[in-house]
Amino acid sequence: MPTKLENFTKQLHAVWLPSFCLDEKRKFDPAGFKNASIILSEFDASNFLRAIDSGLVLDTGGGRYQCLKSSAQEQIFWEGLKSVVPRPLTLWLEPVITMGTIARLSLDFGWPADVLGMQSKDWAFDFVVYQSPTSTKEHISGEVKTTAVQCDKLIADLQTYGRTGAIEPLSENPRHKNSFKKWQSLLKSRANLLWVVGPDDYTHLFEIQYGPEKTASFLKTTLDRLQSKCADQINTS
């Protein structure tokens, strides 16, 4: 019986890559795809397939994917230099994990499709769970990183910003500026939970307690708190 990764790879070559390459706005040669870029765990391959097969993530054509609660469209291929022929294409791990996480939120934790979105309104976070289909209030803000180290660094930055009530990035380092953008987004959205997701089920979930002077505490909690039935408990506490 084929593994989930084998099924993923088969569909990539048979469906997703041709759709992406043959789009009128691209016209790429599929031969440019680098098979070595399929560095994906069974866990992540399985969840991506669940997202597509369940219809939680909609294939809008031309290799573009979208959720019901957001207008943002994602793609799963990274485009290399135009000057190289055929143009190099690689699998883009971050959106693959993001879409798989959308599947987990609905199929494992009970959230309806119409509260799930990819990309927050300010583009600070990769995925969002809204409080209701008609609400713009974020209950869960989520970020995907392609390595465990990147996850840990983001968490450390946000904990520092929250503890100090930071009003500027820790430095001009792009990483610090990016994490500061997320900190500012959380202060504005007042999301209840932060879910940081890495490859192969590397994950950290935090309840956010907002304090005075633009401070916040990130309290690590279990994935049980992701259950949709827990939302009312958090929102009314």
Give the positions of each predicted feature.
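A short, conserved, highly charged catalytic patch centered on acidic carboxylates
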Residues: M1-L193, V197-S237
